[in-house]
Amino acid sequence: MKKVFFSLLAALLLVSLVACTTKEKENDGWNKDYKVAMVTDYGDITDQSFNQATYEGAKAWCEENKVHFTYKKPVSDSDADRIAATEKAIDEGYNVIVMPGYAFAPTIQEVAGKNPNVKFIALDVSKGDFAADYELPSNVYCAVYQEELAGYMAGYAAVKEGYKKLGFLGGMSVPAVVRFGYGFVQGCNAAATETNTTIEIKYAYAKQFFGDAEITAVMDTWYGDGVEVVFACGGGVYTSACEAAQKTNGKVIGVDTDQSYIINEKYAKGMCITSAMKGLAATVKTQLSKTILEGKFESKIETLGLVSATDLASNYVQLPTATWSMTKFTVEDYKTLVGKLYNKEITVKSATSADEVNFNEIPNVKYLGNLK
């Protein structure tokens, strides 16, 4: 009888302990109303670029604000698998979905309307990525960036720094990459005109967002032909430019984030002269704050670019000043350039498709199309 009594007592104590533990978890300050999930597009969260910047921004915000966070990677690069990964997150109770990349437009069209209580924060998804008659539902926010401005800054800075033989290696000819590249060649040519310098620009798309032996071999020929610096624009494709640059003491321009940390550490000190950045993490943090903390979620497609002529760090497109290494084109010169762009003293053309721009008609550009 005593044995039965003590067994029942132990069971009751165990139930009590579990209940207390559960209660503690419920009261530990973690947000009970929202859970955030990020789904990636073509790449993964170690690309040292677009996906990683978005992931790190979302994860850091959620940890700071005690909001549960997870990351979902589609099993393949297809609309069906992006939809499946998104729906899986929703089924698991995640009600704020962060989506980096224009490829999520079909997923939004398929999933958002069916889940009105879920908020979707999409980066690089523009009106042109949706079907022509699609109306943005009230639970979707999209951010697009003026990458042409960041590209212009990088190209202008490179030529002012003294580089005369340049290259642009885009990942795929998607809208953001096209804007980066189009701005880059405009900036290069503007600086060349101001300094009365003759320049040459090789321009191509890898047709993928990762580097490999084939792309590296092409970069070997570029640097071997005298190219001094390549703007490597598109996920992990920068690795091919860096591998080739190592062999000739060549230089690279990073993209999306300040890539000097990874490039200079992994490949060669001083290889990365600057990076054409956009505020991916800042956008995610701002929208998560509005959605979860302030209850001010706004459904719209918002274009983000320069918001200040003087507060450089607040701009959504910029060059990094904390790791500045250029000596002929100084931070003060950069501030002057930003002021002129902000005040529209300089205008930069934009495009969303490679078909919109005849690169062969742009001075000093040798357009090579797709490398694969």
Regions found by a protein language model. Give the residues of each.
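Positively charged n-region of N-terminal signal peptides that target proteins for export
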Residues: 1-4, 8-9
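Prokaryotic Sec-type signal peptides and long signal-anchor helices
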Residues: 9-10, 188
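C-terminal motif of bacterial Sec signal peptides marking the signal peptidase cleavage site
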Residues: 16-19
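A residue-level marker of the well-folded mature domains of exported/periplasmic proteins
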Residues: 23-372
